[in-house]
């Protein structure tokens, strides 16, 4: 972490004073927390990368340094129709325009590393809760990322504070938690994944799973959401062992997941991309099947698979 303060500038260069020194590695990002830059969110390289991703038919496109909803809409114009857009909330302007950004996105990433540079550190936990709460209310996928198990870059076990951090993110309603440096440059990538998985499983098994059921999830399709909410209520009241959903787009399991049922959600789909995208949803286990023609076939394959 290096901190510079600009002391003099011209149109093409600047002179700075090193306030906090350190090792400067290649390909590192530069943040300007006290400035509003007029740079385009999408560069020519970004557009070329998106085109390459379209050729591969990628499942997700994560958009860095989103400022407003227009940034998301501009990306949607370029990607394949069924590719999901994940907005990375990293800037002050993104926090200011949070609701409109979430509304236009398929999912949101709480990018705490860059947020911690742009905003005072003491505000980050509250902002994280606001992002997750607003995303859950709008029925969007959520990812919490950055510095979750930083100590495990060099240590074989996490700190107590890191365990609490991951636990609170799950209790706040995140669908997914993500590792970064721990697995990309760390000494213990496998141990890091195992530690995070163990924490997630423990929270899911022992916590009050109804902590999100009290929220009124206000997604656009009110009928589908009402049916999903009713299905979860019936499943909870009857102590059902599983909830089964058949889907092509992934919308139904997303809504079911947002209501945090006690039972796991088994989702059957014929679409490869939907199968992959369902990996990010809380409490969902997906099954790839061939196309079925009747509801009798659906009941048959569900019963056969669940046994």
Located regions from the model:
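Non-catalytic helical/linker scaffolds that mediate oligomerization, partner binding
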Residues: 1-307
């Amino acid at each position: 972490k290096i901190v510079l303060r600009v002391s003099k500038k011209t149109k093409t260069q600047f002179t700075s004073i090193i306030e906090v020194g350190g090792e400067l590695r290649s390909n590192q990002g530069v943040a300007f927390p006290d400035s509003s830059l007029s740079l385009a969110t999408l560069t020519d390289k970004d557009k070329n990368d998106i085109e390459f991703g379209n050729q591969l038919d990628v499942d997700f496109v994560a958009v860095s340094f989103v400022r407003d909803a227009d940034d998301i809409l501009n990306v949607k114009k370029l990607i394949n129709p069924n590719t999901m857009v994940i907005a990375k909330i990293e800037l002050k302007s993104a926090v200011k325009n949070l609701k409109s950004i979430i509304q236009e996105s398929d999912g949101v990433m709480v990018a705490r590393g860059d947020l911690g540079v742009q905003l005072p550190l003491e505000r980050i936990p509250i902002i994280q809760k606001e992002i997750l709460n607003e995303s859950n209310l709008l029925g969007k996928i959520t990812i919490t990322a950055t510095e979750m198990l930083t100590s495990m870059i060099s240590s074989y076990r996490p700190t107590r504070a890191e365990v609490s951090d991951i636990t609170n993110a799950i209790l706040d309603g995140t669908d997914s938690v993500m590792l970064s440096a721990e697995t990309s440059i760390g000494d213990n990538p496998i141990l890091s994944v195992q530690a995070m998985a163990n924490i997630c499983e423990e929270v899911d098994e022992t916590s009050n799973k109804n902590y999100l059921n009290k929220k009124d999830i206000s997604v656009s399709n009110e009928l589908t959401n009402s049916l999903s909410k009713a299905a979860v209520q019936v499943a909870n009241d009857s102590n059902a062992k599983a909830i089964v959903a058949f889907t092509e787009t992934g919308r139904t399991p997303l809504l079911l997941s947002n209501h945090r049922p006690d039972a796991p959600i088994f989702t059957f789909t014929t679409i490869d991309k939907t199968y992959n995208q369902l990996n990010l949803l809380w409490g969902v286990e997906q099954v790839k099947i061939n196309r079925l023609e009747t509801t009798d076939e659906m009941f048959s394959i569900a019963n056969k698979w669940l046994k």
